[in-house]
Amino acid sequence: MSAPTMRSTSILTEHLGYPPISLVDDIINAVNEIMYKCTAAMEKYLLSKSKIGEEDYGEEIKSGVAKLESLLENSVDKNFDKLELYVLRNVLRIPEEYLDANVFRLENQKDLVIVDENELKKSEEKLREKVNDVELAFKKNEMLLKRVTKVKRLLFTIRGFKQKLNELLKCKDDVQLQKILESLKPIDDTMTLLTDSLRKLYVDSESTSSTEEVEALLQRLKTNGKQNNKDFRTRYIDIRTNNVLRKLGLLGDKEDEKQSAKPDARTQAGDIVSIDIEEPQLDLLDDVL
């Protein structure tokens, strides 16, 4: 019969738990061990009878036993090599037709379930859905942590405002603070009035001094070549600015006189060209209201 293939050897190794060749090696080692015990016993017996008359033949006995041991080893190796070939080719071998038919089921394959492609795809889809759910949970957790941080900051701000408000409400012994508190009552109406006034100022500023209107005016002045009109535009913007500052109480009498003075025409023309008016942010008032 032919020599065992790699498929046959691998299946037998997995089934037995050790390579098939190790079984033959164990047999040869056991025979060699018995042979060594025999030669050792023979040498011991001959050495006990080594003296014949006055002559001692101990060295000759040791040399002869060693040669006998070598001959026995060669004989064992030669004959058990034949045994090894026979066992591997005829005993520890699985025929190819059985390997091709897949008739073997090992111990670890008894509960093995063969899954078809449809079930495999369903399992992959379920696994993918679980992974997406886990990722979504991580994202929600991250968003919640950010919101918790914002809420903690807001809570800290509210506590500080509450502390300041309590200090303001407890100012019964301070006459000056009592007068200020009385002048602000009712506080809700005062805050509403301030926000309405600020909104009106923003709307007026956008309708009269927006960036688009100023740029359109400068373009018209450059096209027509009427540089004198720049003085009127500058004075107009100064008057509107002074009115706004005066309503807010931020402009004194001396500052009013300085702002109403006529500047040099060249300075006015240079300033108008470099005017950079920012757009009013009306959404800031929405947060206040």
Curated annotation (Swiss-Prot):
- Which UniProt keywords are given for this protein, alphabetically ordered? Cell cycle, Cell division, Centromere, Chromosome, Coiled coil, Cytoplasm, Cytoskeleton, Kinetochore, Mitosis
The biological process GO terms on file are: attachment of spindle microtubules to kinetochore; cell division; chromosome segregation; kinetochore assembly; mitotic sister chromatid segregation; protein localization to kinetochore
Tell me which InterPro entries the record gives: Centromere_Mis12 (IPR008685)
Which segments does the entry list as coiled coil? 105-147
Q: What is its main location?
A: nucleus
Signal sequence bounds: none
Cellular compartment(s): Chromosome, Centromere, Kinetochore; Cytoplasm, Cytoskeleton, Spindle pole
GO cellular component labels: cytoplasm; kinetochore; MIS12/MIND type complex; nucleus; outer kinetochore; spindle pole
Top-rank taxon of the source lineage equals: Eukaryota
Please tell me what else the database record remarks about this protein.
Answer: Present with 2610 molecules/cell in log phase SD medium.
The entry's family comment says: Belongs to the mis12 family.
Subunit structure of this entry?
Answer: Component of the MIND kinetochore complex, which is composed of at least MTW1, NNF1, NSL1 and DSN1.
| Role, per record | Acts as an essential component of the kinetochore MIND complex, which is required for the spindle checkpoint and kinetochore integrity. MIND plays a role in establishing a bipolar spindle-kinetochore interaction by joining kinetochore subunits contacting DNA to those contacting microtubules.
What name goes with this protein?
Answer: Kinetochore-associated protein MTW1
Q: Which organism is it from?
A: Saccharomyces cerevisiae (strain ATCC 204508 / S288c) (Baker's yeast)
Gene from which this protein is expressed: MTW1
